[in-house]
Amino acid sequence: MELNIADLTWEPLIYPREGKNEKTVKAYVEALTIGAQFPPIKIQRVFNYAKENEKIEATLILDGIHRWFAFQECGFKKIKAIEWKKKTLNYETSRIALLVEAAECNTRHGDRLSPNDKRQIARDIAMSDPECTWTEEALAQKLGVIQQTVNTWISDIRARQRASRNIIIIRLNRLGWTQEQIAKVVGLSRNRVSEIVGNTNFREIDTLLSQGRDMDYIAKHYHMDLALAWSLHLEGKTDQEKFKELGWGLRTWDQWNFNECDERFGDDWPGRIPAQLVAHTLFYFTNPGDLIFDPMAGGGVVSDVCLVFERKCQSFDLATSDNRPEIQYHHWDPQDGHWPITKKPDLIFFDPPYYTKKEKEYKGKANEKTPSISSYSKGEYEKFLESFFLLAHQNVKEMTRMAFLNADWRDFQSTPALKENSDNSITIFDYHRMLSETGWKVTHRIECPLSSERMSGDQVQKMKEKRILGTIGRTLIIARKWGEAIMRDNNYQLIE
């Protein structure tokens, strides 16, 4: 078949060369001018190909890039081509296969691959293959080199990947995952997971600390995150000893002012909460070994703190990421009655979006089919929370506690206090009512105010001039399961 030259794409990430060889292109141009015939180039049609911030369909060149350049220089509009696969491939999931096919084609003929080209291909494939499905032997056969050469090229990458895989296993194990669950995540057998858990030790941590190394160095040394490094270092210490080692003061009153997030715990995330707040909740309302359930995990602050304080943790979120294997995908639709864990938790740490406060930020984490609750109307938001509280009540044990963190929301923007419409507000009193009506007895109310420093001086001055009263109220409500809540005629009834 013949294709329009302008419709073809050269993708350097899958084309196995450091760059085009101008001498080869020039030789092909000279051959074309005297009527030489060239074999067809090899192409592949793909979708999900990223171009200028959008995903498109494209036709990629797998073999014949120098012929393509030569045909362009000679003014040809079309070029003969053959397809590798008749089926259009998903570029995102087929990139390694495309790279391997291109490499094999360019190893056999034409302007053959240099040793540097082959080395880079092997490293690209290895870095894109954390499950190590491409063995050194298989790569050697494709690239036309001996296995030992490939070993030399990619040994450092494979070592990091094995270390990373082992770190994931250790992390999930310490968070209370079963070996069967871990095996599914890392693609190993349960027996192999058991071996790694049993044989991995980090005794060198104390030695490194005694030599003056800090925790940042230790985390990098073991290719692990800081939270896991701290978890290993503080293992066996009491909660109070851990607070001291982490440099956190322990608050003994019901007002927790933590305005700064501790960068050691959790990822950068909309509405990220301070790790100290989570740690205080665990200290007062759980014991080591308890299971914590985080239904909207976000950047993973709760699981990181649970890791350090030796609590088990099951985390879920609408938006997941590769660097957070402990956070599993779940879209909450309380109406369908699906509860994603079988073991009953000791504490639910529920930190949902604070109504519409971060609607724009959360929008990027969701989609039309599974929207963030920050996009809900007031009625939809309240109904969601009521349904979640009821669903949770039906799936926990008698003494399970709910730690519910939320902030007052008032429509005070550009509105003087006297003219605010309270019908648009959602405050802690509403959340207290919802919990009580769905079978939860509130036992503690802890004030955790948001920082007022997020307002500029000009904003504050305008608020004064217009008599606008802002809100920085945020409250942690602790409630325990109490009674049985059932719905009759669209109203909740509590049976004690």
For the regions a protein language model found, what residue spans apply to each?
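Exposed loop/turn and edge beta-strand positions of beta-sandwich/beta-sheet ligand-binding modules
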Residues: 55-57, 163, 473
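Class I S-adenosyl-L-methionine-dependent methyltransferase catalytic core
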Residues: 170-174, 178-187, 195-496
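Hydrophobic (often cysteine-bearing) scaffold residues that line and stabilize catalytic clefts
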Residues: 21, 118, 270, 274
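Amphipathic, charge-rich alpha-helical segments that serve as recognition/docking helices
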Residues: 15-18, 29, 69-175, 198-200
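Key DNA-contact positions within bacterial/archaeal DNA-binding proteins
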Residues: 148, 191, 227
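Short, charged/polar connector segments at secondary-structure boundaries
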Residues: 1-85, 261
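Generic structural signal for well-ordered alpha-helical scaffold segments
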Residues: 29, 33, 123-127, 279-283, ...
